[in-house]
C-alpha cells in the first residue's frame, strides 16, 4: 500500500477536475490508429521501462497498438524533431526528459522550437541523482570526497552520458556548491560511462539510480549520497551529508506536437494519471529506482519554466558550451 500524500492527493484532484471534460469533449474516434511513442534514447536506457509500461497500459485501455520507437542521437534532437514534424492528432507522443529544457540553453540552432513546437501533457517520473564512485576512491562520505577532490584539483575524473546532459550539469552544480574542480569525461550514452566507471578508468558519476543500482548492490560501485533516490536504502541524502545546496533531479514526461486539440491532451493526461497512480505501476518503477511524479499540463508547464531558470543558472556559471 502507498500512503496518501500531498502528491497523490494533488494528482487525484487533477484527475477529478479534467476527467468529465476530457470524456465529454475528446473526439470519440481517438485513438483510431496505432499510437507511436518516440523515445530519444537507445533501447535499454532509463526511459524504456516507463515507455513500455505506458505503452502496454494504453493498449489495454484503448485497444490500439502502441509502438515504442527509439531514435537515439543528436543529444535527443533526432527523436524530438521527428515528433515536432508529426501530425498533431495525439497519435505521436514524445517521451522526453530534462534534456528538452537543457538543449535550448546550449544549442543555438536547434531544428525545432522546444517551447512553441510542443504542448505539455504530463510528467511521469522524477529521477534523483546519486554520487557514485569506483571502490578505489578513498572516500566513504561526501565530505571525504570533497576533501579528496580539493586536494587534487582536476585530479578526479567524472563521467557523464554526454556533454550538456543532465548528469553533466548535476556534476557542475556539485562543483559549484562544494568548491571542487573535477574533470569532465563525456561519453556517448550512459552505458559506456558506467562501464568505464566499473573498470576504474573514471572515478565518479552523478547518475540516476536506474543505471547503477545493480552495481551498487553487488559492491562493484559505491554510492556516497543521493538527492532522495528510491532504491538506495542506507545511503544518506546530500542534505544529511552536509551539502543541502546540491538539489537537482531529472524527469521524464510526455509531450505532443503543437496544435494537438486540448480534448485529446486531456484524454491522454487522464489515462496517464490512472496508469501512473496505480500502486502496481509505482511498485514496478520503484524496483528500477524511479519514482512516479505525475503532473498535468499546467503544472508540467510551470515546472519547465522553473527548470529552465535553474539549469540555465548552472550552465552560465559553469560556462558549459556545446562542443
Language-model-derived ranges and their functions:
Residues 126, 212-277, 306-309:
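C-terminal lobe and pocket-closing loops
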Residues 19-21:
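N-terminal signal peptide c-region/cleavage motif recognized by signal peptidases
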Residues 85-91, 105-192, 238, 251-284:
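Hinge/capping helix and adjacent helix->loop/strand transition within the periplasmic-binding protein
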Residues 95-100, 160, 170, 190, ...:
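Beta->alpha turn/N-cap motifs
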Residues 24-116, 155, 179-204, 208, ...:
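N-terminal (or domain-start) structured segment
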Residues 1-13:
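N-terminal secretory signal peptides and thylakoid transit peptides that target proteins
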Residues 32-34, 177-180, 217, 240, ...:
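An extracytoplasmic/periplasmic, membrane-proximal ligand-sensing/linker region
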Amino acid at each position: 500500500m502507498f500512503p496518501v500524500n500531498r502528491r497523490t492527493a494533488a494528482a487525484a484532484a487533477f484527475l477529478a477536475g479534467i476527467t468529465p471534460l476530457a470524456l465529454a469533449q475528446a473526439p470519440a474516434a481517438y485513438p483510431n490508429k496505432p499510437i507511436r511513442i518516440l523515445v530519444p534514447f537507445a533501447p535499454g536506457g532509463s526511459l524504456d521501462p516507463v515507455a513500455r509500461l505506458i505503452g502496454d497500459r494504453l493498449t489495454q485501455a484503448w485497444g490500439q497498438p502502441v509502438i515504442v520507437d527509439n531514435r537515439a542521437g543528436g543529444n535527443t534532437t533526432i527523436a524530438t524533431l521527428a515528433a515536432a514534424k508529426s501530425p498533431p492528432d495525439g497519435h505521436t507522443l514524445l517521451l522526453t526528459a530534462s534534456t528538452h529544457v537543457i538543449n535550448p540553453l546550449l544549442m543555438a540552432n536547434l531544428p525545432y522550437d522546444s517551447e512553441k513546437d510542443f504542448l505539455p501533457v504530463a510528467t511521469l517520473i522524477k529521477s534523483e541523482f546519486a554520487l557514485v564512485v569506483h571502490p578505489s576512491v578513498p572516500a566513504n562520505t561526501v565530505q571525504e570526497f570533497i576533501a579528496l577532490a580539493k586536494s587534487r584539483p582536476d585530479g578526479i575524473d567524472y563521467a557523464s552520458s554526454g556533454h550538456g546532459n543532465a548528469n553533466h550539469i548535476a556534476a557542475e552544480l556539485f562543483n559549484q556548491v562544494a568548491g571542487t574542480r573535477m574533470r569532465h569525461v563525456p561519453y556517448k550514452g550512459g552505458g559506456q560511462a558506467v562501464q568505464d566507471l566499473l573498470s576504474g578508468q573514471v572515478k565518479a558519476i552523478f547518475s540516476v539510480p536506474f543505471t547503477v543500482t545493480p552495481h551498487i548492490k553487488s559492491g562493484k560501485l559505491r554510492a556516497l549520497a543521493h538527492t532522495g533516490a528510491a532504491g538506495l536504502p542506507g545511503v544518506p541524502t546530500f542534505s544529511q551529508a552536509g551539502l543541502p545546496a546540491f538539489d537537482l533531479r531529472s524527469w521524464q514526461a510526455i509531450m505532443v506536437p503543437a496544435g494537438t486539440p486540448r480534448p485529446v491532451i486531456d484524454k491522454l493526461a487522464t489515462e496517464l494519471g490512472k496508469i501512473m497512480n496505480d500502486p502496481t505501476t509505482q511498485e514496478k518503477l520503484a524496483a528500477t529506482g524511479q519514482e512516479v511524479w505525475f503532473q498535468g499540463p499546467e503544472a508540467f508547464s510551470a515546472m519547465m519554466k522553473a527548470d529552465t531558470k535553474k539549469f540555465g543558472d548552472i550552465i552560465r556559471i559553469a560556462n558549459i558550451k556545446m562542443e
